[in-house]
């Protein structure tokens, strides 16, 4: 089965990437995972290139061949992709296009609480692991984590 998604996130995961987006047809979140148990389903960097050699970017609209649902209680958005096939570039979306398909979620809590972490006993009860939220009062602070190292914290 093929899904058309708008790429919304890409982050590092083991030696690969964690990639998620919005399903254009359903408006639901989709996280792309591989069948590689050593990387816990991370998508290899080479699997994020189109046939023409261009690399997938945020807000790209792509067609991806899905080989199955993952049935993961903690990350119910996970779908297994066929990594033997290139993802196919369809076009570029704007943030307005995304919000038309999937409006920002109005949540009092993210992942079931107001903290930057989730308790282990609560993780199976949340029912989602991805959310699109509108931030109205963002504050970025520089935090010292060692003698010569600083890090930003939101």
Language model region names:
Residues 65-67, 82, 141:
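A structural detector for beta-sheet-dominated domains
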Residues 5-8, 19, 31-34, 79-90, ...:
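Generic preference for hydrophobic/aromatic residues in regular secondary structure cores
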Residues 80-121:
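Short peripheral tails and domain-boundary helices/loops at the edges of structured domains
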Residues 1-64:
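N-terminal ordered "arm"
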Residues 69-81:
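Short, Lys/Arg- and Gly-enriched loop/turn segments at beta-strand edges
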Residues 114-140:
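Intrinsically disordered, low-complexity linker/tail regions enriched in polar/charged residues
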Residues 144-154:
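Residue-level detector of conserved catalytic or cofactor/ligand-binding positions
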